[in-house]
Amino acid sequence: MTNNMAKNLDEIMEEHIPNLASDLYKTCNDLLRLQMSGGTGNLYFVVPGQGVEYAGSNDRNIRGYIVRWDLYKQIGMPEIKNDEDYVNVIAQMVEAAGGVTKSGSTLYGMGISGTSLGDWYARGRYIAEAGTRPTFEGYLYEASVKDGTLLNGYTDMDHSAFWVDMRFYNDMYNAGLLDPDSFTMTGSELGEKVKAGTYVASRTRDNNLYNVNVLEDVNTLEGYVMIPSEGAVMHADFLTPCGYAPGDYTFLSASSDNWEAAAKVINFYHDPDVSRLIYSGIQGTHWDYDADGVPQLKDEVFQKATELGYGSEAFFKETGIWGGYWELTPWCETGSHPDGYFYSLFQEQTNRAKALNAMDKDFATTYGFATPSAYHVSLIDSGKITTLVGERGLLVTMGITDIPLDVQRIMTNCNDILFQYVAELVTAESDEEFNAIAAQCQTDLADAGEADAWQWCSEAYAKSFEVVNPIFEELQAEYLAHPAGRP
């Protein structure tokens, strides 16, 4: 905007992007004008993922304590309250499987593609001890999911996704449960190992394991599930009134000779029926309205979802239903269509049980519920589980547009320092050695000027927080009064 690269959408909206002028987008557009206009009050961006992500959780919830369901059942489903319990459960599953895969190779507890710093703390964000979300994207100043308080993930070692994960991976390594290839493995290499059944647990729910096994046995229980725990943050009820901004956004180039064609594309995607199309398929082919005006998926679509897995590559190839958002999809799955139902009809509570695969159905019935998400909701609404309903860090950082270069350099240097210590921390042979390495890391961070970067970022965050927090709390109160996605 400083260089006049982005076109002012307010000037062309009525004629060229009329769908964006709909009241459906008023909250988002007003927030973008407030937080991402460079002080002009104009609209320059469109964003994906608006609504409430994972309203009422999700039957394939991807974050938290992830285990291989068949083995977890085999060892008696012990409770997982914290990372210590998790490591013990992982060890029991490896032992129950005899320590080897079907092909006879070594069975590990977990592996990650650890070629960047972010790989080594993505899991830790969803452990309640930290409970943070990406805020200053790519850096360790992250907001608490509970109340939006900015936490210093470099130095506050008790509330840092990085330090939580360093302790966890150190415990895993010393127990012989962490794949040593984790330090050098690429994402594609990890994916192949997951498909081969190399791990009994996963940093996130990786459906590749199940998707491979279900092709051989439609009733397989060999796949990953998330075990709800008071020690983890559940990825549910995530209010995204401004989508995934400021990390994800689209703008029209002010210098383009073809901006009108680009505006047509944006207008097309902001037709709410297009988001329904992306998540639920073609009206008349995959779903239609019944006599009461309720959108209903067709039985054959449920059958394919059950057999192949909604959102899987096989399901997409068979039905043409993508089942996921991309950068120009304005709404998330559990955003509300003007007809009053979710954009993804698969996420309606009346439909969730119909679309379950055999493994997820077995998980739900084992715990006495119709769906995994119904089990999750019972814990959420009874106050036993922390969710993302308090996350507002994204809205706050939307208003922080110009981080000084010297501050960016300090934070980048701090990231480099942390990454340099990862291998030493993970492979430390004792608590004493781990603590000594951590102390030296803290000294290096201090010498790099981390305190100066923290001062600037915390002050900028506080200023933006003051502006946007009252708006968020009003939206939060409205949602909590009538939470969506409940049985």
PLM regions with names:
Residues M1-P487:
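Extracytoplasmic/secretory soluble proteins
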